[in-house]
Structure formats: structure tokens, C-alpha cells
Amino acid sequence: MLTNKGKNIMNSQLVDKFFEAMSNSDVDTAMSVLHDDCVNHDMGSGQVMRGIEENRADMENWTNTFSDMKVEPLNHVESGDTVVTEMKMTGVNTGDMEMPDGSKIPATGKRVEMQGCQVAQFQDGKMIKASQYYNMMTMMAQLGLMPE
């Protein structure tokens, strides 16, 4: 049950703003959506980013790895201060991909397309917690880094 429809609409609009900023490699605008204490769980890689600087570094890694990356929200489901978003990400791997252990995989020049889901919680008009769910193996197979 939606307890505050106006607030939820604002929260889903913030998710849209965040994804649009990612799609435009506009890291500053994306960071403006995040709470200073935002914790971001990347379930595909197993990484956890805490605070603005770690989230900024993560987003810069994604936008450098996929210079033409587009993140498209397909559907929002909202309840209270939580927004669940189905999303589609596309991009061409034009830059080295930094892995969680700090190693780098050279660019493949291959295109990826994958769907996933983000669960985001909001506090004080900012994203305080987010978890992205996607299949890392799908992405690695599309990049030619493992058998399909």
C-alpha cells in the first residue's frame, strides 16, 4: 500500500534522474541524488560502496568501461520510501574494466545488453541505500570473456 503517493512519485523521479545521469556520463548529477551516507550493493560483482566518493569511483568505472552506456528504467514499483526498478543496460566495452580486486580487463569492443533490477531506499529526499541485481556471467559472456 502506498502511504505517501507524492513522496513515492518524487523518489521514482530521482531514480530516473540517476539513470539518466549515468546514461549521459554525468557523474556529478548522479551523485546529487545520493545521500552522503549512501550504501550501494552491487550484487553482480559483490562490491559494496559506502559514501559519495566510493559511489563516484564505481560510477566512473562503469562510464569509463562503457563510454556509450545507457541505463533505461523499464518499470517502477513503489512502497513507502522504497522504489524497485526493472532496468535495461546497454553499452559497448570501450575502456578497461576494473575488477573488484583492482585488476583490469582490457576493452573488448563488444556490445552488451542486460536487464536487472535495483531496489532503492530514500531518506530526506536522497537515495540512502541501493542494491543492483544483474547477471554478471551474462555480461562476461557477451564480452567474450567466458563461454556462452
Feature annotation, model-predicted:
Residues L2-E148:
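C-terminal and inter-domain tail/linker signature
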